[in-house]
Each structure stands twice: as structure tokens, then as C-alpha cells.
Regions:
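Non-catalytic signal-transmission and effector/linker regions of two-component phosphorelay proteins
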Residues: 1-6, 116-131
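Conserved acidic segment of CheY-like receiver
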Residues: 3-15, 20-24
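The short loop immediately C-terminal to the conserved phospho-acceptor aspartate in CheY-like receiver
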Residues: 13, 56-57
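The feature encodes the CheY-like receiver
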Residues: 17, 59, 68, 77
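Short hydrophobic/Thr-rich beta-strand motif most characteristic of the beta2 strand and flanking loop
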Residues: 28-35, 43
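Acidic catalytic/metal-coordinating carboxylates
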Residues: 35-39, 62-68
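Active-site residues of response regulator receiver
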Residues: 55, 85
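Alpha4 helix (beta4-alpha4-beta5 surface) of REC/receiver domains from two-component response regulators
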Residues: 65, 87-111, 115-122
């Protein structure tokens, strides 16, 4: 068992990744990072984090693709995943609200990257507290 929850943060925006991972570290979490969907999948298999915060739109494979791959793999299917995006409507072809859409495909939640980081930290704590 880990002393602190391990969070994998995945984003192709390096500055945002640095800011978010620093905030999470200072808030009592161990943090690892990945810069694309393939790195995220590999890190998930290797480290089995308690939560993955996954950017939706990245070059190459999308965060949605990576999250679904993680959820379909028997070794990683129980890892909690929450989507990150700064888009008001990350799935423009659906009528579902973004939080509902994330949950409908097996993700824990949707986190708006433009929110105050204290709100993000609280959402992370809330997600980890869920059974």
C-alpha cells in the first residue's frame, strides 16, 4: 500500500502539466506525468496509479482513446480516470453534458483545466474517496 496516492497526469501542454503536477505534489500526492496517450498507457501498466488525469485532445491518439484502452485492459481496468479539458464542449457531436459523457464511457469525472487549481485538488480528493 502506498503512503500517498499516486496520480498520473497526462497532457501535451508541458507548462500546464508542470503547474498541475506541482500543485498536486504540494497537496500531498505523488505525481508522475506523461505527454501523450501512448506514454499514459505504458505508465498506467507499469505504475498502476490511483488516478489518471487525462487530457482529452492530444496529438496522435486522443485521451479518450487512451482512457478506453486502459479501461479495456484487464491489468488496468480498475484504475480511476478523469478527463481534463479546457474546451467548453470537448465532444461536440453529442448532446450529453461533458460530465455525463465522461461517466457514460466509464470515466470518473470531467475536470475543467481553467478551474482554480484548489478546485481541481478537491475534485481529485473526491474522486479518490469514491469506492
Amino acid at each position: 500500500m502506498r503512503e500517498k496516492p499516486l496520480i498520473l497526469v497526462v497532457d501535451d501542454e508541458h507548462d500546464l502539466l508542470e503547474i498541475m503536477s506541482t500543485k498536486l505534489s504540494h497537496s500531498g500526492f505523488d505525481v508522475i506525468v506523461a505527454y501523450n496517450a501512448n506514454e499514459a498507457y505504458d505508465a498506467a501498466k507499469k505504475t498502476h496509479p490511483d488516478l489518471i488525469l487525462m487530457d482529452i485532445h492530444m496529438p496522435g491518439a486522443s485521451g479518450t482513446d487512451a482512457a478506453l484502452r486502459i479501461k479495456q485492459d484487464p491489468e488496468t481496468k480498475d484504475i480511476k480516470v478523469a478527463f481534463l479539458s479546457n474546451l467548453k464542449d470537448p465532444w461536440p457531436t453529442t448532446q450529453a453534458p461533458k460530465e455525463g459523457m465522461a461517466k457514460s464511457i466509464g470515466m470518473e469525472d470531467f475536470i475543467d483545466k481553467t478551474e482554480d487549481l484548489d478546485v481541481t485538488v478537491q475534485k481529485v480528493r473526491d474522486i479518490l474517496a469514491r469506492k
